[in-house]
From Swiss-Prot:
Its cofactor is Mg(2+). The Pro/N-degron targets the protein for proteasomal degradation when cells are shifted to glucose-containing growth medium. AMP binds at I27, I28, E29, H30, Q31, T38, G39, D40, F41, T42, S122, Y123, R150. PROSITE patterns: FBPASE. It is an enzyme of class 3 (hydrolase). Ubiquitinated. Targeted for proteasomal degradation when cells are shifted to glucose-containing growth medium. This is Fructose-1,6-bisphosphatase. The gene is FBP1. Keywords: Allosteric enzyme, Carbohydrate metabolism, Hydrolase, Magnesium, Metal-binding, Phosphoprotein, Ubl conjugation. Pathway: Carbohydrate biosynthesis; gluconeogenesis. It comes from the Eukaryota.
Length: 348
């Protein structure tokens, strides 16, 4: 007689888990929740995970194959392009085109959006292929950040599909390439974290239902820009350095890597706040809305945190007028962001 296996998972033996949840399994389980699902969204996520694996592999070999260093050009936003920036951009363009489903791609490395006319799907992806690449020479963790929009009804793929309010995203994620490769993903119903098992070649669910601590006295900001901040920002940062009544009369601790993905990932796990305010050098902010501020804000809110700009406006309520529009950002534990909002008179 055959053995029928159903119901709850079988317990693993000797501490070795044989019933792991891979990213494809996770995505398929999510798809099953929607009776009319076509599978298109699953293909979008599959294309993204392939690109993350490809970039991860390439970064680990970068020094060996002479991919570290400047490519001798600047991208549209004015950043000096590294060789890996160029290669990462190519990886994402090819992966999104090969999906057959993704119609529109916005990349930090491209001045204009890219439309794939032969693709038949209804999704747009906005990404920073390799965020923090200036840190690669020093071996600092870098990452990829991406947001996903569903195309507007009857659209064949235009700029209007992405110049939309941040809360219209259907998914957001980032991959961090460090001692291991981590993927943090939201599909709009919470946040889950995965770690790449290089032997299996699969992202494994390691941080289910990721929640940011509601309060933690840690701040992450580039204080080298203090001279260029306005008085409101400067006085707030000085305030958190003073003894805090809700932190046993101890000041905030400072933690700053200089790679947004690494700093935000630490903030997710331990709590606190991450900020990149406007300053005299960047009066409109430094971080791009579509592929940096929006996805990180979406992830943060889905994990129980908050994300606002210097004026206290919710990041996801903003609407860009250009694909490379920038913004200031304050994100992290709700308790710490509330302190900033109180400071600027925007209590929520």
């Amino acid at each position: 007689m055959p053995t029928l296996v159903n119901g709850p998972r079988r317990d693993s033996t000797e501490g070795f888990d044989t019933d792991i949840i891979t990213l494809p399994r996770f995505i398929i389980e999510h798809q099953k929740q929607f009776k009319n699902a076509t599978g298109d969204f699953t293909l979008v996520l599959n294309a993204l995970q392939f690109a993350f694996k490809f970039v991860s592999h390439t970064i680990r070999r970068a020094e060996l194959v002479n991919l570290v260093g400047l490519a001798g050009a600047s991208n549209f936003t004015g950043d000096q392009q590294k060789k890996l920036d160029v290669l990462g951009d190519e990886i994402f363009i090819n992966a999104m085109r090969a999906s057959g489903i993704i119609k529109v791609l916005v990349s930090e490395e491209q001045e204009d959006l890219i439309v794939f006319p032969t693709n038949t799907g209804s999704y747009a992806v906005c990404c920073d292929p390799i965020d923090g690449s200036s840190n690669l020479d020093a071996g600092v963790s870098v990452g990829t950040i991406a947001s996903i929009f569903r195309l507007l009804p009857d659209s064949s793929g235009t700029i209007n599909d992405v110049l939309r309010c941040g809360k219209e995203m259907v998914a957001a994620c980032y991959a961090m390439y460090g001692s291991s490769t981590h993927l943090v993903l939201t599909l709009g119903d919470g946040v889950d974290g995965f770690t790449l098992d290089t032997n299996l070649g699969e992202f494994i669910l390691t941080h289910p239902n990721l929640r940011i601590p509601p309060q933690k006295a840690i701040y992450s900001i580039n204080e080298g820009n203090t001279l260029y901040w306005n008085e409101t920002i400067r006085t707030f940062i000085e305030k958190v350095k003073q003894p805090q009544a809700d932190n046993n009369n101890k000041p905030f601790s400072a933690r700053y890597v200089g790679s947004m993905v690494a700093d935000v990932h630490r903030t997710f796990l331990y709590g606190g706040l991450f900020a990149y305010p406007c300053d005299k050098k960047s009066p409109n902010g430094k971080l791009r809305l579509l592929y940096e501020a929006f996805p990180m804000a979406f992830l943060m809110e889905q994990a129980g945190g908050k994300a606002v700009n210097d004026r206290g406006e919710r990041i996801l309520d903003l609407v860009p007028s250009h694909i490379h529009d920038k913004s200031s950002i304050w994100l992290g534990s709700s308790g710490e962001i509330d302190k900033f909002l109180d400071h600027i008179g925007k209590s929520q």
